[in-house]
């Protein structure tokens, strides 16, 4: 008897997490746990026997490190992997490395009340598994650091220009691919990536080591400067605002928008109001529709807007919604976005004050 359900294999050294993930997944009508494993060595045999559609993998495990296993898996049998991580500094750094190696997304285990907390995540975990099952897993080719490559030519423009980016599932690597080639005097970049608190600081620090521009977690009230990228902190909405002739960052903990905080729509809406035609809006890979309405507002305010194309997306959800809404002027491959941003910034000439 064949089943159209998404087949999931859960790998975790915690019996509690294996049990909770099984309960969450088996409660959904369109997915099922076909097996569980306490470590990667057991999982290796179960993958051959059960041929799962999605693997959930604990970041830190005995017998074989989760990262070592993931690296081998993505090299030999690329498949959608959802990481399960702890909310620690070490856990966040390992998780970011896992995303770099090809994991689709991650779930952060609650620090307290794991059983209740995980069950509260039921809808989110189910959505992540559905997105993972539809994703395009790919082995990650080794690339030289961006600083070893020639940078893109910096555009001639005023400090009024600003690049606004929104992303979700698959976004951490997509953002890296966009930022790495940018020259040190690139226009300022503001980024909202769906990510819980505790991970965005590690994400910013990781990017800062790889990029020519400075990358940091955003701070409320700070001035937005060329040559800098600002990542919205987890659990905080980020907005672009005006203070006299300058752009500044505003953070707030208003309720989630589209079930997310930070929300891409919140950032895009603020950019439409504060920067208008001086802004460039970019929507990258991700599930759901967050950002579609805001990108349309940016386009209507005179901003140049673009969406990542389906072929280069891990999950073609947010870009598709933006395209359907008529929000994206152009749709291009991820590899072409950095050059398109610099070309567009220069083509627009000296920025006009709003």
From Swiss-Prot:
Keywords: Chemotaxis, Cytoplasm, Hydrolase, Phosphoprotein
Segments forming domain Response regulatory: 7-124
4-aspartylphosphate modified-residue sites: 58
Protein name, as recorded: Protein-glutamate methylesterase/protein-glutamine glutaminase
SMART domains referenced in this protein's UniProt entry, alphabetically: REC
BP GO annotations: chemotaxis
PROSITE patterns per the UniProt record, alphabetical: CHEB, RESPONSE_REGULATORY
Cell location: Cytoplasm
UniProt source species: Chromohalobacter salexigens (strain ATCC BAA-138 / DSM 3043 / CIP 106854 / NCIMB 13768 / 1H11)
Annotated signal peptide: none
InterPro entries to which the protein is assigned, alphabetical: CheB-like (IPR008248), CheB_C (IPR035909), CheY-like_superfamily (IPR011006), Sig_transdc_resp-reg_Me-estase (IPR000673), Sig_transdc_resp-reg_receiver (IPR001789)
HAMAP family: CheB_chemtxs
Known catalytic reactions: [protein]-L-glutamate 5-O-methyl ester + H2O = L-glutamyl-[protein] + methanol + H(+); L-glutaminyl-[protein] + H2O = L-glutamyl-[protein] + NH4(+)
Post-translational modification: Phosphorylated by CheA. Phosphorylation of the N-terminal regulatory domain activates the methylesterase activity.
Function: Involved in chemotaxis. Part of a chemotaxis signal transduction system that modulates chemotaxis in response to various stimuli. Catalyzes the demethylation of specific methylglutamate residues introduced into the chemoreceptors (methyl-accepting chemotaxis proteins or MCP) by CheR. Also mediates the irreversible deamidation of specific glutamine residues to glutamic acid.
